[in-house]
């Protein structure tokens, strides 16, 4: 790892620690969960996982949690509505602007 990468990792760690200690992490996290719930994202991801389990069950194929997670995770990330992604990014930018100034 390069010195620049080490410094970047250290800054990232400090930001994460400050986000948590200031309570902003909980605020952003709760708002994100609410927005995802209201958008139906949780239901859609549950349906996706259930379909995958049913398909594998129909073929008498056992699926581990890790396999299911590997299948669902990228699709679930793509399913997050763009307005929610933008809102969370805006909240993080606002937080960073306040911390840096």
UniProtKB/Swiss-Prot annotation:
Q: Which UniProt keywords apply?
A: Activator, Chromatin regulator, Cytoplasm, mRNA transport, Nucleus, Protein transport, Transcription, Transcription regulation, Translocation, Transport
Return the Gene3D superfamilies for the record.
Answer: 1.10.246.140
Give the record's GO biological process terms. chromatin organization; mRNA export from nucleus; protein transport; transcription elongation by RNA polymerase II
What is one cellular component GO term in this UniProt entry? transcription export complex 2
- Transcription regulation found in the keyword field: yes
Q: Which GO terms describe its molecular function?
A: transcription coactivator activity
Q: Where in the cell is it found?
A: Nucleus, Nucleoplasm; Cytoplasm, P-body
Q: Which InterPro entries match?
A: TF_ENY2 (IPR018783), TF_EnY2_sf (IPR038212)
- Write down the superkingdom of origin: Eukaryota
According to its UniProt entry, the function of this protein is described as:
Involved in mRNA export coupled transcription activation by association with both the TREX-2 and the SAGA complexes. At the promoters, SAGA is required for recruitment of the basal transcription machinery. It influences RNA polymerase II transcriptional activity through different activities such as TBP interaction and promoter selectivity, interaction with transcription activators, and chromatin modification through histone acetylation and deubiquitination.
- Quaternary state and interactors: Component of the nuclear pore complex (NPC)-associated TREX-2 complex (transcription and export complex 2), composed of at least SUS1, SAC3, THP1, SEM1, and CDC31. TREX-2 contains 2 SUS1 chains. The TREX-2 complex interacts with the nucleoporin NUP1. Component of the 1.8 MDa SAGA transcription coactivator-HAT complex. SAGA is built of 5 distinct domains with specialized functions. Within the SAGA complex, SUS1, SGF11, SGF73 and UBP8 form an additional subcomplex of SAGA called the DUB module (deubiquitination module). Interacts directly with THP1, SAC3, SGF11, and with the RNA polymerase II.
Q: Which family is this protein grouped under?
A: Belongs to the ENY2 family.
Q: What is this protein called?
A: Transcription and mRNA export factor SUS1
Per the UniProt record, the source organism is Debaryomyces hansenii (strain ATCC 36239 / CBS 767 / BCRC 21394 / JCM 1990 / NBRC 0083 / IGC 2968) (Yeast)
């Amino acid at each position: 790892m390069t010195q620049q990468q080490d410094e970047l990792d250290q800054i990232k760690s400090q930001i994460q620690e400050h986000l948590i200690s200031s309570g902003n992490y909980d605020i952003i996290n709760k708002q994100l969960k609410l927005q995802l719930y209201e958008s139906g994202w949780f239901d859609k991801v549950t349906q996706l996982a259930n379909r995958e389990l049913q398909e594998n069950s129909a073929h008498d194929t056992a699926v581990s949690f890790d396999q299911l997670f590997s299948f669902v995770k990228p699709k679930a990330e793509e399913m997050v509505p763009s307005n929610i992604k933008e809102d969370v990014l805006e909240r993080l930018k606002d937080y960073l602007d306040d911390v840096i100034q």
